[in-house]
């Protein structure tokens, strides 16, 4: 009965999110789209099904929070640009009597000190800008193979004199078959409201519907992941009609194949012994959106990294290429406060 009720609430929330779709970039709190954990970053930037997920991956899918994350703390750092940094920290605890795992996560994006000017370009001074969110995640297991969870996020954003607050909810579901070493994942992200707007009118949140699968080969130390992002929207082409009136920089209309494959994110892990994992990923949409016409695209859309697994410490690193001359680095440390048997 509880599971059926959970599914009913889940789909009601999903369809509520489907009713609030906006042009990419025109919604509020778009920093919620960013992935600030290097494990997901190295896998292409989206993954909701990885069954060896670190605690930081809970920001991708709340149902990835497991009992194994008990007493784990994680700190993540992302360098997006010379003056833009992203920080994400999380901690988890398993409530044995309630068979429930809970986690607290904090996100902070700082955009540095910016110049404040008037309409004529005269410098008036400087201001600071940042985005923040505080999330509480709850996850449980059902019938040994099903995991379900949700994250409630409080959002705070300030750009100088302009401030905004919001409330968002993520819900997730996983099916894990340990014998076949395969996991399927589902997440509906950023469903909520803007409580206080920057100006007079309120904006929608950047809703996303993500599906994924991760499979480990039986006779080779390799895991593959296939993830579909923004599955509620068929055509992901950024088509700003107001901007296109100038016909400057307008890309050709996407064909059917491009529309389909733009949803996909591919990822792979190579297990080097028991302590080292090499990771690579490819984000089709990122390569399409950020390529520069008539110029070589290079590694745009590709990402890679590694993680080092020690007894109580895990270290993750990722590098993501946005354009030939632009990439960002991510690093994360996860520490288990209690050893097994403590």
What do the predicted segments below correspond to?
Residues 21-342:
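Subset of outer-membrane beta-barrel
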């Amino acid at each position: 009965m509880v599971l059926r009720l959970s599914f009913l609430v889940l789909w009601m929330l999903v369809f509520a999110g489907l009713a609030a779709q906006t042009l990419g970039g025109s919604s509020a709190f778009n920093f919620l789209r960013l992935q600030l954990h290097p494990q997901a970053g190295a896998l292409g930037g989206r993954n909701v099904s990885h069954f060896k997920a670190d605690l930081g991956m809970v920001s991708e899918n709340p149902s990835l929070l497991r009992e194994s994350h008990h007493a784990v703390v994680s700190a993540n750092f992302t360098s997006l640009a010379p003056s833009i940094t992203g920080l994400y920290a999380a901690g988890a605890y398993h409530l044995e009597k309630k068979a429930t795992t809970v986690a607290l996560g904090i996100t902070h994006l700082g955009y540095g000190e910016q110049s404040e000017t008037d309409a004529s370009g005269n410098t008036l001074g400087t201001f600071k800008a940042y985005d923040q969110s505080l999330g509480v995640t709850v996850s449980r297991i059902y019938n040994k193979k099903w995991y379900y969870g949700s994250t409630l996020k409080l959002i705070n954003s300030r750009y100088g004199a302009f401030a905004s607050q919001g409330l968002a909810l993520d819900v997730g579901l996983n099916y894990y078959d340990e014998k076949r070493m395969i996991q399927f994942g589902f997440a509906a992200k950023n469903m909520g409201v803007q409580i206080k707007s920057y100006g007079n009118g309120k904006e929608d949140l950047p809703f996303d519907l993500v599906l994924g699968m991760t499979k480990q080969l039986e006779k080779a130390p390799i895991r593959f992941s296939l993830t579909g992002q923004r599955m509620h929207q068929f055509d992901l082409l950024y088509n700003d009609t107001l901007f296109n009136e100038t016909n400057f920089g307008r890309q050709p209309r996407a064909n059917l194949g491009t529309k389909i494959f733009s949803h996909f994110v591919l990822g792979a892990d190579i297990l080097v012994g028991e302590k080292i994992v090499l990771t690579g990923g490819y984000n089709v949409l990122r390569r399409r959106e950020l390529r520069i016409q008539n110029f070589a695209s290079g590694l745009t859309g590709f990402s890679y990294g590694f993680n080092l697994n020690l007894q109580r410490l895990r270290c993750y690193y990722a590098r993501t290429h946005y354009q030939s001359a632009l990439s960002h680095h991510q690093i994360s440390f996860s520490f288990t406060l209690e050893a097994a048997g403590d």
